[in-house]
């Protein structure tokens, strides 16, 4: 424990004993003084930052209790007291009798020193180790002195053989010659150098006979064991650990302590060395110490003595456990796999594997665990080679399986497309039957109406006939009565009371001629003659060559073709943006004559100033003309430069002559001209301006050989009859099958998805549940509704519960699982919605119409040219196009029906909006189901944890149960840390050594593979919180 005060004491004073002060009820000081004293206590306790932070949060009452507890212990002896006593034991001039008296209390002094190093505050330890006291040097020297007699016993010096003593002294001098004296204090660079240097340090000053006899007295006691405990206490502090690791021979002396006859001491040494191996940089130091051990003890092989002790001292289980643990760690804690195999082979040569086979059936469970841990960590090179070969075979198998899976995937896609086609075909048949049913219903209704009408007419006629039968006798009686009355009254009397105008109406009309039909309207006048065509043809570009300027008449404008200019030197390019020839007319440039200006300029000086670099002397223009005349004549080009260059590139790709290309276009030969080339060539259909320029060139009867290859091709190309229609027809012929294969699956997807969505009963029930919950939530505020837009399905995730942990969709998924489990897989009834969601029906219908127009173009061309290629194409593909058009109509009708069925408008809701609603809903529903399952598992874990905590509280009432729980938690935590992918690293922090030793006693060391690291470590947080 940390202490605040210390009092000096001489070497003869009694040992340091913790003095328990009476508890007393000391009143609490003022807050300022309390904080000062509490700060001192915290600094003396040397706690980690997080633990110190927790203590600072205590209230003043708890702080005062802690101060009182800490101040009950005071250090009676300062560090130099123990140092002086140890130095007195090392005095070579002391008489043997006096030494016997002194050495009687050596073990007691060392034990008190160990307690002080372990329990006193860090300030006391630092004082013991500072440069003034050099307590570590004194302690290591005493350890060396205590066991030097053991080293001489290995040479048979127990009997005092002078020859052997001289031999050892001579051997020591030869070792001393390996290193110069000034190199003794330098840090080690490798194991061999360190071993040689430490041997020199140990034996450069050999002890006398009196010192050896004194050493034998010490070796018979527990001084070596307690010295190791003191060093272990020092190394448990970061400051002390660094000092021990940098000490010239501290670790070597610890390793040499393995020669002690006490098995407890050997076990303690091995535990300490194993812990050092697991600290960063410690493994190299331990190996160097055993190199030194080999030189000092004259081993033939490193670790030879260790294996000898391991085999011979089988009666002490603790030592064997510690030895097996050390071997496991020193071999398997390295990251370099090759070095690990090397260390493993070192112990194999020393007979470790044979001994382990004999010891595997030991009765000690601890030893069995350590042996099994080593065997589990063994790096089997042969097995790795076999695994590598197996891996190669497995990789080949994986490739085969991947290829097989690829074929199966393709087959699955084909089956899916075939299934979709069948569904679409059935849907089309269903729609056709529905249409027929509607027609039959309509016919039935019309027939029923006609029958009803006929029955009504028959009934009316029968009633009229009956009335007539009843009225005929009366009519005859009235006629007879009326005749008699007319006979009594004359005709003049009848007409006397009638006005003249009425008499005229009663008089019969005079006969008239038959009315002739009206003549037809005059024909409309003939339309006026069309106006003259405007000048739309662009003027021809200037033609290169040495020919004189030529004036071409194009429409109403005249463009003079400029002759090319020959220069003496190559000149740089002026990157201007040129106007096109058809843009010149009406501008200022049409009024300029730059050729006339050239006659007035000093062109020689211009070329000299602006010529490009690295050119030879100027060429004589006359000579140049003569040489040019000897060469092939320069070509004339009529096409625009970039267009001509692109055309040349396209023609080179074809690898055909102009005649072959034009002949193939005449015959619609797609074998000679691939469709890709046809589509590229369609970009170079001659414009009207180009045709005029080419025709003008021909009318002038200029030689065609002077034209560039592109211009000659364009000349032949433009003479092809109905060129535009032929090229469009060829492109249609070449792309028809691809378009058909592209459009058919899209239409089938629309048809199949529309049918599945419309006919899904489970989807209807899901919507019914959503409608019910929505009305339940909204009825009090907005009133109940009879339906909702499908876009409302996206809002199910936005409606969250009060604790914000669940959405309405999660609740629906939970409700379906509990109340309607048959609806849980409703999405299996919605076929092909994902494919339909990616279809733009409007574009597909436009493409189908384009195919129809293209087929009509082929029909016209076939009627004009009667080409066999076109006839064969029509006979083969007209039926396919008709079927595609019917499918398009069916898809449109099926989609319109399903959209209206769900209350949407086909005009405002395309398939790319309608079907993705279902895709998102299905995906969100599945995720909600998974999250519900995860939440359920988490709740179960929390419930079990809560029950375990309650049981733990009940069981933790007894100390034994509490310790058992702590131990189980510690082991579980350690195993979790071992299983981590990224291993934490032990740094040199306070408490590290004790943490490692505690861990290794609880859990055996487990090595890592080459890819994951090969060492077991604990992280810093584990030191601070769980103390391993």
Curated annotation (Swiss-Prot):
Q: What S-S linkages are listed for this chain?
A: none
UniProt KW Phosphoprotein keyword:
yes
Name the chain's protein: Formin-like protein 3
Please give the organism.
Answer: Mus musculus (Mouse)
List every stretch annotated Disordered. 1-28, 493-541
The primary site where this protein sits is cytoplasm
Q: Please describe what this protein does.
A: Plays a role in the regulation of cell morphology and cytoskeletal organization. Required in the control of cell shape and migration. Required for developmental angiogenesis. In this process, required for microtubule reorganization and for efficient endothelial cell elongation. In quiescent endothelial cells, triggers rearrangement of the actin cytoskeleton, but does not alter microtubule alignement.
Which locations, inside or outside the cell, does it occupy? Cytoplasm; Cell membrane
Instruction: Please state every residue range assigned to the domain named DAD.
Output: 986-1018
Q: Which domain of life is it from?
A: Eukaryota
Q: Which residues form the GBD/FH3 domain?
A: 26-472
Q: Where is the lipid attached (N-myristoyl glycine)?
A: 2
InterPro entries xrefs: ARM-like, ARM-type_fold, FH2_Formin, FH2_Formin_sf, FH3_dom, FMNL_animal, GBD/FH3_dom, GTPase-bd
Residues with the Phosphoserine modification = 174, 1014
Q: Pfam families, from UniProt?
A: Drf_FH3, Drf_GBD, FH2
Spans of biased composition, class Pro residues? 12-28, 517-541
Task: Tell me a GO cellular component.
Answer: plasma membrane
Lineage of producing organism = Eukaryota, Metazoa, Chordata, Craniata, Vertebrata
Which proteins does it associate with, and in what oligomeric form? Interacts with SRGAP2 (via SH3 domain).
Q: Which residues cross the membrane?
A: none
Q: Where is the signal peptide?
A: none
Q: Which UniProt keywords apply?
A: Angiogenesis, Cell membrane, Cytoplasm, Developmental protein, Lipoprotein, Membrane, Myristate, Phosphoprotein
């Amino acid at each position: 424990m940390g202490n605040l005060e210390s009092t000096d004491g001489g070497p003869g004073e009694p040992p340091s004993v913790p003095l328990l002060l009476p508890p007393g009820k000391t009143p609490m000081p003022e807050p300022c003084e309390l904080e000062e004293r509490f700060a001192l206590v915290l600094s003396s306790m040397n706690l980690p930052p997080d633990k110190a932070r927790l203590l600072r949060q205590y209230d003043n009452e708890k702080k005062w209790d802690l101060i009182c507890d800490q101040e009950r212990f005071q250090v009676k002896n300062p560090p130099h007291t123990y140092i002086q006593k140890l130095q007195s034991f090392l005095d070579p001039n002391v008489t043997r009798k006096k030494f016997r008296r002194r050495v009687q209390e050596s073990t007691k002094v060392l034990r008190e020193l160990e307690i002080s190093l372990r329990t006193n505050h860090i300030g006391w330890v630092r004082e013991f180790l500072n440069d003034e006291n050099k307590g570590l040097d004194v302690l290591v020297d005493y350890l060396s002195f205590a066991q030097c007699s053991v080293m001489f016993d290995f040479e048979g010096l127990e009997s005092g053989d002078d020859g052997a003593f001289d031999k050892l002294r001579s051997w020591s001098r030869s070792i001393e010659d390996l290193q110069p004296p000034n190199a003794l204090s330098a840090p080690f660079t490798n194991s061999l150098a360190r071993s040689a240097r430490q041997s020199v340090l140990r034996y450069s000053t050999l002890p006398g006979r009196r010192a050896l006899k004194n050493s034998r007295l010490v070796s018979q006691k527990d001084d070596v064991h307690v010295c190791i405990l003191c060093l272990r206490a020092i190394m448990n502090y970061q400051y002390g650990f660094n000092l021990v690791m940098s000490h010239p021979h501290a670790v070597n002396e610890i390793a040499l302590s393995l020669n002690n006859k006490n098995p407890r001491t050997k076990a303690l040494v091995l535990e300490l060395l194993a812990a050092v191996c697991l600290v960063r940089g410690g493994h190299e130091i331990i190996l160097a110490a055993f190199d030194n051990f080999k030189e000092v003890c004259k081993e033939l092989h490193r670790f030879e003595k260790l294996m000898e002790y391991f085999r011979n001292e089988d009666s002490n289980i603790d030592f064997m456990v510690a030895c097996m643990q050390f071997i496991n760690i020193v071999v398997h804690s390295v990251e370099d796999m090759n070095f690990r195999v090397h260390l493993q082979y070192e112990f194999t040569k020393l007979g470790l594997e044979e001994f382990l086979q004999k010891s595997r059936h030991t009765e000690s469970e601890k030893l069995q665990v350590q042996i099994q841990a080593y065997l589990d960590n063994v790096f089997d090179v042969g097995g790795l080679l076999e695994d590598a070969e197996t891996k190669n075979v497995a990789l080949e198998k994986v490739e085969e399986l991947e290829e097989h899976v690829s074929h199966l995937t393709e087959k699955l896609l084909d089956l899916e497309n075939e299934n979709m086609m069948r569904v679409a075909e059935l849907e089309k048949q269903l729609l056709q039957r529905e249409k027929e049913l509607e027609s039959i219903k309509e016919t039935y209704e019309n027939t029923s109406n006609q029958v009803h009408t006929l029955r009504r007419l028959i009934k009316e006629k029968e009633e009229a006939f009956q009335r007539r039968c009843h009225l005929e006798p009366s009519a005859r009686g009235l006629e007879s009565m009326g005749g008699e009355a007319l006979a009594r009254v004359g005709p003049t009397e009848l007409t006397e009371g009638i006005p003249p105008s009425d008499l005229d109406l009663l008089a019969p009309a005079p006969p008239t001629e038959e009315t002739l039909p009206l003549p037809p309207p005059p024909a409309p006048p003939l339309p006026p003659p069309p106006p003259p065509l405007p000048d739309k043809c662009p003027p021809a570009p200037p033609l290169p060559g040495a020919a004189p300027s030529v004036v071409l008449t194009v429409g109403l404008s005249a463009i003079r073709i400029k002759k090319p200019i020959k220069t003496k030197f190559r000149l740089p390019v002026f990157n201007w943006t040129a106007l096109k020839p058809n843009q010149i007319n009406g501008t200022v440039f049409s009024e300029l004559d730059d050729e006339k200006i050239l006659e007035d300029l000093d062109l020689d000086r211009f070329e000299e100033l602006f010529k490009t670099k690295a050119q030879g002397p100027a060429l004589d223009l006359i000579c140049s003309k003569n040489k040019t005349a000897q060469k092939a004549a320069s070509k004339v080009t009529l096409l625009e430069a970039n267009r001509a260059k692109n055309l040349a590139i396209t023609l080179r790709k074809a690898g055909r002559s102009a005649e072959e290309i034009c002949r193939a276009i005449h015959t619609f030969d797609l074998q000679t001209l691939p469709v890709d080339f046809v589509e590229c060539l369609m970009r170079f259909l001659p414009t009207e301006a180009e045709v005029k320029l080419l025709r003008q060139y021909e009318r002038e009867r200029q030689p065609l050989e002077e034209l560039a290859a592109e211009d000659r091709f364009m000349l032949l190309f433009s003479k092809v009859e109905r060129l535009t229609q032929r090229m469009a027809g060829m492109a249609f012929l070449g792309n028809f099958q691809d378009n058909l294969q592209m459009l058919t699956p899209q239409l089938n997807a629309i048809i199949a998805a529309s049918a599945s969505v419309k006919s899904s009963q489970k989807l209807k029930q899901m919507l019914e549940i959503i409608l019910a919950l929505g009305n339940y939530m909204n009825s009090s505020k907005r009133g109940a509704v009879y339906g909702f837009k499908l876009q409302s399905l996206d809002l199910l995730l936005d409606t969250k519960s009060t604790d914000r942990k669940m959405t309405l969709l999660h609740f629906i998924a939970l409700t379906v699982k509990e109340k309607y489990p048959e609806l849980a897989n409703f999405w299996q009834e919605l076929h092909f919605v994902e494919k339909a969601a990616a279809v733009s029906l409007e574009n597909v219908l436009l493409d189908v119409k384009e195919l129809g127009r293209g087929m009509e173009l082929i029909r016209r061309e076939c009627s004009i040219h009667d080409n066999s290629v076109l006839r064969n194409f029509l006979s083969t593909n007209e039926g396919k196009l008709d079927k595609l058009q019917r499918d398009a109509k069916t898809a449109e009708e099926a989609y319109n029906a399903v959209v209206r069925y769900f209350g949407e408008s086909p005009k405002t809701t395309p398939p790319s909006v309608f079907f993705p609603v279902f895709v998102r809903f299905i995906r969100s529903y599945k995720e909600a189901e998974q999250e519900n399952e995860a939440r359920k598992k988490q709740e179960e874990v929390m419930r079990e944890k809560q029950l375990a905590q309650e049981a733990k509280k009940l069981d933790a009432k007894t100390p034994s149960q509490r310790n058992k729980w702590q131990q189980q938690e510690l082991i579980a935590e350690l195993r979790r840390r071992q299983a981590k992918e990224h291993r934490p690293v032990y740094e040199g922090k306070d408490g590290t050594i004790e943490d490692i030793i505690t861990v290794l006693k609880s859990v055996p060391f487990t090595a890592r593979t080459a890819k994951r690291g090969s060492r077991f470590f604990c992280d810093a947080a584990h030191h601070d919180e769980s103390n391993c």
